[in-house]
């Protein structure tokens, strides 16, 4: 009853309730043409054959022993957004799209699954492991340091569908699949194609987007194909911040009255990007086929930051008399290529492949200074840092069906995998990290007395995570894995699948064995139950092991206040981190249970409900920032400035996540009024911390630490795991088709989120919100479609931060939906 307690008030004040009512009525409406439905119509998605979730023979979605969601190309394109990450989050209730609004992390948005960070969901392309990004996660809700996959480097135009396995699958696919698997299936075929142009912008006038997309197929040899896809997009920047409350100029300066009080421009960066993809197959004979795919992406970003005030020690008035907004510039290059062969021999189906992927992120700045160099500082830097991640994967898989072995149908699959990966960082220009020792003079350039006289200027290029030679790293490792998978039908209604996987890492991650048992029992043609029990693991990312950086931007004080600070992430094996109690990282281990039902209660109606339980031991998190006078002797002994805020990665928590996924689909036929496909999705999840590791001995007994913090992992890090993601999410939609006219309506409710700080007084809560999207399309001449639409059409914003910073930063906190407000767009597409 509590769920509907405020319904009258919502009906009066929130126009979104109209959208919800429309969807709800459609879901309750009986199918008017039910008596005319064929058997095929009565089983939605029965013909959708999938390749994710079970080794061996392919199965349909409704026959899968594990929960699978299918996202089609048409659904992705109708979200109205240019990036694959946000499109997925809009369509699936168990996924949430985070927004990092500062620094280089604002170009890669975290896609959480079942409240677990992106690193716990494995990404495949055509069933093969996708390489990771080079950038460690260090953003708003995910500061784990893991480098997850950047799926925005895959063009949406290349996607035929996405198969989402909502189940732990480490025993089948290896490390990282604790929360599930995203399998991107690329378009194939020698015929057909699509061209599209989209233009749109935010209601505020910012964030202007222009996008071109296209794909087409060609014949290749005798019976083969080559399918090409490309996207190109340009997005303007956008920001959402409060006006600053502090002063920009020294007392008595008349310029203070005319300052616009824009203390920060954090938000969406300006982006120019293009992505290319191909997918090809070439039969050699009746038994053997060669196949290959590749993707290439290039993304250039210009990222704004908070204002360097004229009266601050991060500004040199001879260079910027009125202060400046530093820029982060990113040049991101990403590619992956695969070649393989598949066929039949001696009664076995075999598949042999090799794939190589690389992500290279080069950072520079068109506008910043190193204040410690004084007026001699450059005002731009061509090289601040470079991050690179490489991955080479080799697979051989075999599978065979036995009809009479042991008297029951049996599917046997097995395989071997070798994976090599390397993470590297490269230092930038020496002047960017040089300590120049500049002190402010007694007078300002205008001849007036300088209130900063004698003070040291800030060190290093501003708004930049500069890598110096001492911070560079080069780590690599090999992983060897073997798996077996048995699928058996002991009696006709029951299917059981057992998978075992053994892995060896040649670094400290060591050896591990994972197991998974799936089963499905079909009581009738329309009702079945399924269950899962298994174990999994995730090896520490190379970025979590070896990433090292010094950053001179800001830090979060115990009460959540954003303050200027020099922060440093120390690698766990460094002398500095170990002096502060760090130890080598252990792999994260998981246990999981799942139980679900699939039901088709009426023609053209389907329902799935899946409950899950995931327990993860030794979760890796970044410690809180450690700083203050009590640490001065330790820092000084390591040659580190005693004012530095230091953190590192550690196995800090054991957690338990429990939840429920419900998906309902229904198709209504209204005769002359057309057809409507209704959908409803719901996710509930709750993560609790069941154990917090003790602080290391090195941090205990240090004595008084006035003005500092010795909290190893506290409420802030705990909150990232337990409260930063909404515990509930509803996705309700209806797609109406009447001849050439189409209307697609979707409304999503994001539950409340909370940001915790070390001091409870700094906690912030952000209420639940409904976000509604609408697209109207009309097809001309059978192949040209015009569309207009909007996302967040009612311009709903997150609740404002109750404790904003003096510079106006972090207006909306860590919203689970895009905080920039309403966005409208128009699109023209040509299909052939």
Language-model segments: what does each one mean?
Residues 324-337, 356, 368-494, 694-731:
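Outer-membrane beta-barrel transmembrane domain signature of Gram-negative proteins
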Residues 57-60, 88-133:
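Extracytoplasmic beta-strand/coil segments of soluble accessory domains associated
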Residues 191-194, 204-318, 322, 326-345, ...:
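Transmembrane beta-barrel wall of Gram-negative outer-membrane proteins
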Residues 128-166, 214:
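Short acidic/polar hinge/loop motifs at secondary-structure boundaries
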Residues 616, 686, 746-756, 777-832:
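C-terminal beta-signal and adjacent terminal beta-strands/loops
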Residues 48-79, 134-142:
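N-terminal periplasmic "start-of-domain" segments of outer-membrane beta-barrel proteins
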Residues 84-87, 91, 111-112, 124, ...:
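N-terminal periplasmic accessory domains that precede
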Residues 36, 414, 600, 606, ...:
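Gram-negative outer-membrane beta-barrel transporters
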